[in-house]
Amino acid sequence: MSSACRSLMVVGTSSHVGKTLLVAALCRLLKKAGKKVAPFKAQNMSLNAYVTPEGHEIAYAQALQAWAAGIPPAVEMNPILLKPQGNLTSQVVLNGVAVDTCRAGEYYERWFAPAWEAVKTALARLQQQYEWIICEGAGSPAEVNLKHRDLANTRVALHLGSPTWLVADIDRGGALAHVVGTLQLLEPAERALIRGIVINKFRGARELLQPGLDWLENYTGIPVVGVLPWLDWVLPQEDSMGLEAGPQLWENRRERAGRGSCLEIAVIRLPQVANFSDFDPLLAEPSVHLRWVHPGQSLGSPDVVILPGSKTTLKDLLALQKTGLADQLRLYSGHIVGICGGLQMLGQTIADPAGLEGVAGTYPGLGFLPLTTVLQPTKVTQQVQTQSRWPAPAPVQGYEIHQGSTQADPAGCLPIFEQEGLGWRDPTGRVWGSYLHGLFDNHRWRRHWLNELRRQKGWDPLPELEGHYAQQREELLDCLAEAWRPHLEWQQLLE
């Protein structure tokens, strides 16, 4: 190990306490302090994925943290990605490549040893390149029934000898008890690494909390290094569990934007929804109101319905059919969009000859576009740069993550991009779909599409935008770091 590289581990009392954003904020603060810093998460379970420039698949959360650090995302930052497929099975992505689909017990039998070797190799490579590694744990480090096969928490901290911060979510209630209970369940060597406690999502006056903090420090002997305020704005969620607050947050955006000339876009909340980060740029548009529609709910009368990506296209398509949402879509007269798995659903048929998603066979799609898809074992993971043909010529960049090849009938649909196989539309433009994740990140293309919708409603166009959502994301990451800077004793890391 390189003695020049320092590290900090961030673990939590449970999932969704704010570890991901704290790591992102620390990466940005250290970057601003002139340090070469990289994020790391040994194992992530998420359907929100990103493709690195080399074509490796990692969790989107680690890509976000890499951008916060001012560096390109790399596979070493997330060597193991587990993508749930339902029925207690997950696709195993090791070193950026899908290698297996198995149940939890099978995963630990087949992949625990090679996964730990991949973790150590990834850390060694990062240590050779960076001055700092900010490591994120997963869930809680104190799950005693899982400790012997936990790759992501104190095993990493012990391997690095890394000082560790423990994060608790006070908004849920019981934060002090969560901290004390977590510490009591750790082994002595693990507890000795805990050098700081962070209380996250705090609302109210610090002085009202201070007696509890004093007690906590006295009882545990560990300093409270941060009391982070609740942030009333949206950054990307790590996984679909974080979307449960989504409808409320999206409705709040609507209240702030007002009901003026505001396009309403409904996104179908598929059971295995994937890459919902695709919609962050639309969420940032003040003239757009997004809302989730769960299978079984009424579609309403939105201007646009989007079928997002799915880890299990056939299962999610069946959910639409069983709950009546497919019938609602057939009666719907507005615009329909499909992204990745959603694109596949818009076609005539989806064939699964190898039974990748269950029983082998050919299944009917929704029938909105003359497309036929064949699911294939080989996964496509690559970044893309191309030019759009519709709704106007514009440079476009994004990335593909899919298992399947789609063929289009040129008599019934038109290509959207210069590069073949990325997306198609019907002759009217009312229905379209694309394999391209990150499509809405392209400012110019997104505004062309939104303005076409506005034109059809007789509304004035929005100003054209050049550039990419990455610029707004940079501003959000700066805001995150500056919002937490005065509430976090991060400068002790530099001592």
Curated annotation (Swiss-Prot):
Domain GATase cobBQ-type residues, every copy: 262-445
GO MF terms held by the record: ABC-type vitamin B12 transporter activity; catalytic activity
Keyword Secreted carried by entry: no
Coiled-coil zones: none
Descriptive protein name: Cobyric acid synthase
Pathway stated in the Swiss-Prot or TrEMBL entry: Cofactor biosynthesis; adenosylcobalamin biosynthesis
Keywords: Cobalamin biosynthesis, Glutamine amidotransferase
Protein family: Belongs to the CobB/CobQ family. CobQ subfamily.
Gene3D superfamilies linked to this entry: 3.40.50.880, P-loop containing nucleotide triphosphate hydrolases (3.40.50.300)
Phylogenetic placement of the source organism: Bacteria, Bacillati, Cyanobacteriota, Cyanophyceae, Synechococcales
Function noted in UniProt: Catalyzes amidations at positions B, D, E, and G on adenosylcobyrinic A,C-diamide. NH(2) groups are provided by glutamine, and one molecule of ATP is hydrogenolyzed for each amidation.
Species name: Synechococcus sp. (strain JA-3-3Ab)
CDD domains in the cross-refs: CobQ_N, GATase1_CobQ
